[in-house]
Amino acid sequence: MGVKGLNQLIKEHSPGAFKEFQLKNLFGRKVAIDASMCLYQFLIAVRQSDGQQLTNESGETTSHLSGMFYRTIRMVENNIKPVYVFDGKPPVLKGGELEKRLLKREEAQKQIDSIKDTGTVAEVMKFEKRLVRVSREQNDEAKKLLELMGIPYVNAPCEAEAQCAELARTGKVFAAASEDMDTLCYEPPYLLRHLTFAEARKMPINQITYSEAIAGLEMTKPQFIDMCILLGCDYCETIKGVGPVTAYKLIKEHGSLEKIIEHINSNPTSKYKVPENWPYDEARQLFMDPEVTKGEEVTLKWKEPDVEGLIQYMVREKGFSEDRIRSGAEKLKKGLKTGVQGRLDGFFSVVAKPGAKAGDKKGDKKRGSDSKASNNKKKRK
């Protein structure tokens, strides 16, 4: 679900935390991708001309495999090394959110049943997309495909976003990639959004720098997490009537959820009501100390694709075109053989000229572009 209104709050208070660029700008990077989110996107977006999901002759859905295969190849062709992270068991606190999603799917099915004879294709499609969920079988199929492609994946013990952030924090990869803004609660150095969107959508990739985001908000990590809980997360309900502006204001004024609750409960005229038995502290702990496999225990290895294995699985078992799969496999093979080439910003640093004086405008002017490059220098992953 993500965190409601967080993107806009960061844009307002920390505009410098945002960057937009094209896929090619991630040249030479390793990225941990929320696989469950990707598969969900592929099941919604990868469709036939009539709006229906891709299927083979047996009627099996193959949209997720098509999306995973071709989007991964596009990244590898741009000299990016992806690693996919799959969800493990959901936290107990997430049960309420999962139940809400189930009810929404049931309601969507009722809407489809009521309009399927009289509704337009667009109306039916709108509700059909609400029925989409990633099955365990589809997860397993995606893992098998990745193995054949030579692309590593990680089975998270719990939340995939938390594991992506752990890999980024410990230097295994450059960034975590997910559409869920709550990924920022796990403190990845960088969050990438829109990474696996279709090229036809022409959506630039969004990069959010965590350190700049909380610096602009002037918050500590615990305060940032408390604000996200107030905004609304997957783990618990929020205080009714508290929107982004109010949530930010309350955290700035009181500093923590405990103080906010104390303020509301001690003010009889307050229009806000704290939910009964509100598990905000348990939610906070899930963000502060998530269940993850430590980065140093994870080994990531990109291997040469098994071309004939891909033909057997994707063509003979799943009904894809052999010419297209062979062509894609060759692109993948070439891209992975190239390896991650070093980025220029990983090799150069600026050294002041001997005898240069601080505040020397002439020297500063000459070094302007180099200084900017130095400030933007990032450790190569």
Swiss-Prot record:
Q: What is its EC number?
A: 3.1.-.-
Recite the UniProt keywords alphabetically.
Answer: DNA damage, DNA repair, DNA replication, Endonuclease, Exonuclease, Hydrolase, Magnesium, Metal-binding, Mitochondrion, Nuclease, Nucleus, Phosphoprotein
Q: Member of which family? A: Belongs to the XPG/RAD2 endonuclease family. FEN1 subfamily.
Chain intervals with Basic and acidic residues compositional bias: 358-370
Cofactor requirement: Mg(2+)
Chain intervals for the UniProt region annotation (I-domain): 123-254
Q: Where is this region: Interaction with PCNA?
A: 340-348
One Gene Ontology term of the molecular function aspect: DNA binding
> Where do the annotations place Mg(2+) 2 binding?
D180, D182, D234
What post-translational modification information does the record give?
Answer: Phosphorylated. Phosphorylation upon DNA damage induces relocalization to the nuclear plasma.
Binding site residues for DNA = R47, R71, E159, G232, D234
Q: Which organism is it from?
A: Scheffersomyces stipitis (strain ATCC 58785 / CBS 6054 / NBRC 10063 / NRRL Y-11545)
Keyword check for Hydrolase, yes or no.
Answer: yes
Protein name stated in the entry? Flap endonuclease 1
Biological function: Structure-specific nuclease with 5'-flap endonuclease and 5'-3' exonuclease activities involved in DNA replication and repair. During DNA replication, cleaves the 5'-overhanging flap structure that is generated by displacement synthesis when DNA polymerase encounters the 5'-end of a downstream Okazaki fragment. It enters the flap from the 5'-end and then tracks to cleave the flap base, leaving a nick for ligation. Also involved in the long patch base excision repair (LP-BER) pathway, by cleaving within the apurinic/apyrimidinic (AP) site-terminated flap.
An annotated GO cellular component of this protein is: nucleolus
Instruction: Give the record's GO biological process terms.
Output: base-excision repair; DNA replication, removal of RNA primer
Co-factor remark? Binds 2 magnesium ions per subunit. They probably participate in the reaction catalyzed by the enzyme. May bind an additional third magnesium ion after substrate binding.
Name of the top EC class for this enzyme: hydrolase
UniProt xrefs under Gene3D superfamilies: 5' to 3' exonuclease, C-terminal subdomain, 5'-nuclease
